[in-house]
Amino acid sequence: MIIGFIGIGKLGSPASDFFEEAGHVVKRADVGDSIEDCVKDCEFVFVAVPTPHDPLYDGKYICSDLEPKDFSYDIVKDVITKANKVMNKEQCLVLISTVLPGTMRREIAHLANNTNLLYNPYLIAMGTVKADMANPEMIMIGGDSEWAAALQIMYMNMPVNCNRYIKGTYEEIESTKIFYNTFITMKITMCNMIQDVAMKLGNMNVDVVTQALAESTDRIMSPKYMKAGMGDGGSCHPRDNIALRWLAEELDLGYDLFGSIIHAREQQASNMAKYLKELSKEHDLPIVIMGKSFKPDLEYEDGSPSILVSQFCECTFDDVTKPAVFLLAHSRQTTFGKANKEYDLPEGSIAVDPWRERKDAIGYGV
């Protein structure tokens, strides 16, 4: 099958490669490329352009006290409008970018009146996009049932290990995607609350509690994301929670659960910074955070919990030239199941491991 991909960035690049490696002919268009050339002869055209949030609202800066804001859909609307002009009813646009519930019908669907439109967001993580696409927990497709069925058949003929296809309205799929992401942040924030309790109470190892809960699969579900440590990060989860504050206000729900979660995430970063400052004062050492990106071995800083901690204390990043209080913010073991990076820290330094995995470090949460 010939398919098109508009938007060849952090998501579109590995996603389009995955389709190509699965045997499809993939035509790509990025900024400045011809959309008409990209969509010609394609049955499905995937749109993977950004839906950016205000730069202050991605999760690495303090924002729980700011007014809620929706994502910006200008880029998506521009691409859909241009593609619609050169497509027909024998083709289908497939948006995979994250949007808030209600967006497809309110902002986008009417722009695709010459063709067909589906919403098909992915449950992927930066650094493991191809692996996540090959082994998705579920594949979600919103929109016209006949085109949704055709897209499902395409996936079923690819090397995709998935037994669960969720098809529904735009609103159902928008909500499944966004609440899946924010449910993860809620789990992490709850685990880090237990970590804060351990630090305050004493005589308590956070891992004893979280492991007991993680193994309680009868009612509490999966053990994933049940390791206390740094806050949730990345280009999806924090900003999705932040944006849902806007939706709660827009729909006049009468409460702001996600504002509370984001406030808790920020306060947990503040608590960690306070602990680092106490060590810094006690030992007369500066504070250095090892790992500025939101995840080990990646350069992306979107929603970085390390940068969020730095908002609450005076510190530098990744400087091992002199003794310091070092926060070892990254855990390859927790994130990827790989061996942790070894640091050769200057003599006289203090290492703080919020993941409690290194024998030569102070375990935060014990």
Identify the role of each PLM range.
Residues 1-366:
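Structural/interface elements that position substrates and couple domains in central-metabolism enzymes
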